[in-house]
Amino acid sequence: MNKIILLLLLIAFISCSDNNENISGNTGLFNQTTFFDGLSRDYILYVPSSYDENENTPIVFNLHGGSGTAEEQMNYVSDMRNLSDSEKFILIYPQASSDSNGIPIWNLGGVNSKATDVDDVGYISHLIDKISEFYSVDRDRIYVTGFSNGGYLSFELACKLSSEIAAFASVAGHMFIDTYNDCSPTHPTPFLSINGTEDNYDGIAGYYLPIDNSNNYWIEYNKTDLVPEIIEIDDANTTDGSSVQYYSWKNGTNGVEIDHYKVLGGDHSWPSLNTNSDKGKSNGDIDSNRIIWEFFSRFDINGLR
């Protein structure tokens, strides 16, 4: 009987353990599992070949949309691996837990959440600490971006994990009303948004704010210029049915700024120079991945670098 109990305990211990043995400072692509808050959570880790253990390295979290997966986000929506190689940052694609209907979705808390018993803010914080155990991480340069529901969580993290998040970006995402009501950032926070004017998810009453209101929160909080610089982006792809305007509110506290790319005629999608996307009518005039990284790279937790 004692042997059976011991065996069961051993099985339970193994099932609750992280599979860290294959990372431990190594470079490459890793499908990982970690145990947090009573749940087994998956994520994809990409460490560039340019990683140097003697240098502190930034982290970029890239969050998939509702009903999506980490693998889909990496392979079909926002593959940042080439950027990670050339720009020397660690890339993490976390996987959301599933709601009662089996749909992967990030928990934003509040009365409108579909997964109220899951602590996704704590999960991202856990991943920061976990990866920092095995790699030389620049804790002043932790960035987060996401698509749709992943964009919503990026707002949540900027509000509730502010001490860790240096800057954030949202694509086809908005600020959840509960996030807005409970937001308590602790430092000036640079923010970039990319949204289509034909996105049917923009500002659904009772759930989340229109993107203009979401931007305005951070414009006011960061004390930037109230009048933006506006630039018409070259309509390089004339067959995608859309064009882009760039807005930038500059001169915020500690040099931070708020940038917004308005995709005229664009809908719920992640703009890319490769417009073969299954995520809406994708604009082909801008490279969202590069735009986001170049924005992030200018800032750390203290503001403009």
Predicted regions and their residues:
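Alpha/beta-hydrolase
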Residues: F61-L63, V171, V263
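Short beta-strand/loop motif that positions the catalytic acidic residue
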Residues: S193-N195
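Sec-dependent N-terminal signal peptides
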Residues: I4-F13
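Flexible "cap/lid" loop of the alpha/beta hydrolase fold
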Residues: H174-P190
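Short, proline-enriched alpha-helix->beta-strand connector loops that line the catalytic pocket
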Residues: T186-F191, N254-I258
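A domain-start/cap signature at the N-terminus of enzymes
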Residues: C16-I59, E72, L83-S86, T116, ...
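Acidic catalytic loop of the alpha/beta-hydrolase fold
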Residues: E198-D202, H268-S269
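Serine-hydrolase catalytic machinery in alpha/beta-hydrolase-like enzymes
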Residues: T34-I44, N54-Y143, L153-E156, K160, ...
